[in-house]
């Protein structure tokens, strides 16, 4: 076995059971990984120097194929209603079979860190079959200084072998695709999928398990900080605008997806960004667009023309096209990945029903209610001929990555909001003037203007009305924003149709929250939406 690159000489792959490998390349950097990926036909070079790979059958995560080992340590700690269990015996069989499958292979290893706060960091070794996967995860996690590699000690190891096919009969899984996590022993096994996002979300899942025990709140959010040290957190599901809205030229970006919040403030889990690229434009998102023109960026499932120019309008492979780049590619990104205690929390939703206002102020109890609800609405794929929006409730704005019961995260959030006097806002980046198919997407300029007023504190002094359906406070007027758009009912041609749609959405919220009723106190239950008379 030939071993190349910088590493801790006392910890090779044989320490986790690998044997008879061909070549192992440790901690290769971008240029080296480009050479490897291109030489093996894994990816294409774009006209501007980015690397573009296709993931084949899997163009997104496979949440139904994700498992957690159920053992003596995890049996009472995991929210099993939301996490599928795998036995220690089946996991060990899977591990042995993956190690056997790897014999004769050349593999890539990256020694990285999850968590910019040294006290809460998770040193992570990622072993991949593909060079482009190695570059992807190198972009996404925190890269230690080169001299630190010689003493690197991983607490988590991820083995990612897309060519390995799991066996439901032999491994106790659902399909040939598997993402299995042994939280007790710090090992994640990924097989049967080339979608690179599985690696980053596996690190997130492990941190989401470990950190609450240390009274640190793990969050599926983006974060930025203003010149006055005013940190803002942006919660939101995929497609709601976390990455876009936190990339603000007037504020320092902490990170776009995963953070922790503890006694010292906020810290990024990552050292890079994983931005959606579908319909990406230089006009709307100049900073993210610029990263696609750079050497080192990895693009996933973006269609290239014959000149190797990316066509961001083309969703023929998937709507979930992505680009992964180091955080320092964003001009005003934080160099430390840390920020003071947050002053503002923004909960983003893309309401395709056209019911929610573009912004609303939340009480701490309403904030916990909406955090546990985790609402957005997806628009069905046009290929199915379905135009009705579909409500999606993903608790904590990231249910697939939350191993513990949502109430653990919700109570921690409520405590941190109260302790730090944080102002909370719900922001709708979805539809206005009607539901999807009738109305139009909320203009990003409107959203940015409202966010600016919320973040600089000027929105706190606005006049508010109480929303008739949800009970939260909605500003009546905001400088630079047309007042009509602040009241969603007035943007609909038919007010009665709006009322009916709003009632349906309220009922969806109430039905979804039933499972949390027994886990929250009365003040949070009272924050539920319901028919109210608007206080004009």
Swiss-Prot record:
Substrate binds at residues 61, 195, 201, 322. Its EC number is 4.1.1.49. GO terms for cellular component: cytosol. It holds the Pfam family PEPCK_ATP. GO terms for biological process: gluconeogenesis. Pathway: Carbohydrate biosynthesis; gluconeogenesis. The gene is pckA. It comes from Sinorhizobium medicae (strain WSM419) (Ensifer medicae). This is Phosphoenolpyruvate carboxykinase (ATP). Belongs to the phosphoenolpyruvate carboxykinase (ATP) family. Its main location: cytoplasm. It is found in: Cytoplasm. Binds 1 Mn(2+) ion per subunit. It catalyses: oxaloacetate + ATP = phosphoenolpyruvate + ADP + CO2. Its cofactor is Mn(2+). The keyword Manganese applies. Involved in the gluconeogenesis. Catalyzes the conversion of oxaloacetate (OAA) to phosphoenolpyruvate (PEP) through direct phosphoryl transfer between the nucleoside triphosphate and OAA.
